[in-house]
């Protein structure tokens, strides 16, 4: 059984190309397995609160020493980690916002990157605890950031891959939907190219 966690995060919700392609990719990956199941974490329509003092302090305390507010904050993070840990495949849709991922997606990472839970410090450095998962990134941007003069300003793709790798998720494939504000022809070309890349990934997945 393939357990797929689909995470969408674009503020544009269903009008977003990253959301559209992420849903399509998750659906096709699930269709390979008669028992495949998709769990949706919609960070646009159901945003997470940003981390605060209650969470930072609460996660460092024993459970019986937490206030009600601290316990609630830590329980939310634990639920997100459990959801992520249970998945075999993770599909993340991310639309570039001011050169990086949206605050909605960052809020999710701020909850699941948890010392001694999703990564540990050891003699050889940091080791993630979420190995063995396949990750698919669907990233969208108004401009072209995979190459050309704006490539140095892509603080989305590499940043997300670094965060995922930090917690042990290093098997990452990416579909880019680029140039979405460069006119109708550019949008259609971006959609066609992303569709081809998506199909290739599905075929590679078997």
Curated annotation (Swiss-Prot):
Cofactor binding comment, as recorded: Binds 1 FMN per subunit.
The protein's Enzyme Commission number: 1.6.5.-, 1.7.1.17
SUPFAM superfamilies xref list: Flavoproteins
Reactions performed catalytically: 2 a quinone + NADH + H(+) = 2 a 1,4-benzosemiquinone + NAD(+); N,N-dimethyl-1,4-phenylenediamine + anthranilate + 2 NAD(+) = 2-(4-dimethylaminophenyl)diazenylbenzoate + 2 NADH + 2 H(+)
InterPro entries: Flavodoxin_fold, Flavoprotein-like_sf, FMN-dep_NADH:Q_OxRdtase_AzoR1, NADH:quinone_OxRdtase_FMN_depd
Example of a GO MF term: oxidoreductase activity, acting on NAD(P)H, quinone or similar compound as acceptor
This protein's record includes keyword Flavoprotein: yes
UniProt keyword terms in alphabetical order: Flavoprotein, FMN, NAD, Oxidoreductase
Known cofactor(s): FMN
Pfam families tied to this protein: Flavodoxin_2
Protein residues bound to FMN: 10, 16-18
PANTHER family recorded: FMN-DEPENDENT NADH-AZOREDUCTASE 1 (PTHR43741), FMN-DEPENDENT NADH:QUINONE OXIDOREDUCTASE (PTHR43741:SF2)
Summary of the function given for this chain in its UniProt record: Quinone reductase that provides resistance to thiol-specific stress caused by electrophilic quinones.
Family membership noted in the UniProt record: Belongs to the azoreductase type 1 family.
Subunit comment: Homodimer.
Name used for this protein in its record: FMN-dependent NADH:quinone oxidoreductase 1
């Amino acid at each position: 059984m393939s357990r797929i966690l689909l995470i969408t995060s674009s503020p544009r919700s269903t009008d977003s190309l990253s959301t559209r392609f992420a849903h399509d990719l998750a659906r096709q990956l699930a269709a390979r397995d008669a028992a495949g199941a998709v769990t949706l974490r919609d960070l646009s329509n159901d945003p997470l609160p940003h981390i605060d003092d209650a969470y930072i302090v609460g996660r460092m305390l024993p459970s019986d020493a937490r206030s009600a507010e601290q316990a609630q904050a830590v329980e939310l993070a634990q639920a997100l980690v459990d959801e992520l840990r249970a998945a075999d495949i993770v599909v993340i849709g991310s639309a570039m916002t001011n050169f990086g991922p949206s605050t909605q997606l960052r809020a999710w990472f701020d909850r699941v990157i948890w010392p001694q839970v999703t990564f540990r410090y050891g003699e050889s450095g940091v080791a993630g605890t979420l190995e063995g998962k396949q990750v698919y990134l669907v990233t969208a941007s108004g401009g072209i950031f995979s190459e050309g003069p704006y490539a140095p300003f892509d603080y989305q793709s590499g940043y997300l891959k670094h965060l995922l790798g930090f917690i042990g998720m290093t098997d990452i494939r990416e579909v880019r939907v680029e140039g979405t504000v460069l006119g109708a022809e550019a949008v259609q070309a971006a959609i066609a190219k992303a569709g081809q890349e998506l199909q290739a990934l599905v075929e590679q997945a078997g």
